[in-house]
């Protein structure tokens, strides 16, 4: 008799566990990409600490809200955002008056419906010619 009771209890526990797993899968499917909502509006990726690294992006569609993991590269340019991808030309010649080089970038891809400029211009300081350093390295190897 005890054997039958133990077997019945085990069968009920297994049935309850299977039912709970099925309900959990249904909940995941309802909020995921297969939901009725087609036009998600995604916000920017907000890093969890400092200004780069792993973080979260919030999306809304009607009354639904979702948070997904994302990553902001640590070498991103804050002026035009991490979700705007550009194809850049080569650096231009050094402008002696300002001491900077300029290049232009054309928008290649806007991720997560980001508002991006079609073209951007970026500058960087000109690097001084380093011929003296190159000669010094050659001389060090010879004894």
Curated annotation (Swiss-Prot):
GO cellular component assignments: cell projection; extracellular region
Tissue expression from the record: Expressed in various tumor cell lines. In insulinoma tissue predominantly expressed in precancerous lesions.
GO molecular function, one term: growth factor activity
Induction behaviour: By heparin and retinoic acid.
Principal place of residence: secreted
Protein's GO biological process: adrenal gland development; behavioral fear response; cell differentiation; cerebellar granular layer development; cerebral cortex development; cytoskeleton organization; defecation; dentate gyrus development
UniProt subcellular location: Secreted
Site feature (Required for high affinity binding to PTRZ1 by interacting with the chondroitin sulfate chains of PTRZ1) residues: 103
InterPro entries for the chain: Midkine_heparin-bd_GF (IPR000762), PTN/MK_C_dom (IPR020090), PTN/MK_C_dom_sf (IPR038130), PTN/MK_diS_sf (IPR020091), PTN/MK_N_dom (IPR020089), PTN/MK_N_dom_sf (IPR037122), PTN_MK_heparin-bd_GF_CS (IPR020092)
Keywords assigned by UniProt, alphabetized: Developmental protein, Differentiation, Disulfide bond, Growth factor, Heparin-binding, Mitogen, Secreted, Signal
Physiological role: Secreted protein that functions as a cytokine and growth factor and mediates its signal through cell-surface proteoglycan and non-proteoglycan receptors. Binds cell-surface proteoglycan receptors via their chondroitin sulfate (CS) groups. Thereby regulates many processes like inflammatory response, cell proliferation, cell adhesion, cell growth, cell survival, tissue regeneration, cell differentiation and cell migration. Participates in inflammatory processes by exerting two different activities.
Assembly description: Homodimer. Interacts with ALK. Interacts with LRP1; promotes neuronal survival. Interacts with LRP2. Interacts with NCAM1. Interacts (via C-terminal) with PTPRZ1 (via chondroitin sulfate chains); this interaction is inhibited by PTN; this interaction promotes neuronal migration. Interacts with NCL; this interaction promotes NCL clustering and lateral movements of this complex into lipid rafts leading to MDK internalization. Interacts with LRP6 and LRP8: this interaction is calcium dependent. Interacts with ITGA4. Interacts with ITGA6. Interacts with ITGB1.
Protein's name in the database: Midkine
The species this protein was found in: Homo sapiens
């Amino acid at each position: 008799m005890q054997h039958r009771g133990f077997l019945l209890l085990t069968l009920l526990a297994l049935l309850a566990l299977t039912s709970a797993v099925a309900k959990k899968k249904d909940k995941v499917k309802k909020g995921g990409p297969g939901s009725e909502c087609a036009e998600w509006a995604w916000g920017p990726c907000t890093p969890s600490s400092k200004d780069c690294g792993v973080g979260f992006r919030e999306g809304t569609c009607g009354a639904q809200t979702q948070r997904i993991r994302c990553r902001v590269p640590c070498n991103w340019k804050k002026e035009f955002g991490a979700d705007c991808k550009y194809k850049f030309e080569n650096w231009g010649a050094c402008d002696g008056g300002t001491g900077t080089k300029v290049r232009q970038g054309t928008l290649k891809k806007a991720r997560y419906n980001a508002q991006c400029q079609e073209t951007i211009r970026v500058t960087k300081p000109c690097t001084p010619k380093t011929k003296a350093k190159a000669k010094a390295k050659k001389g060090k190897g010879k004894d």
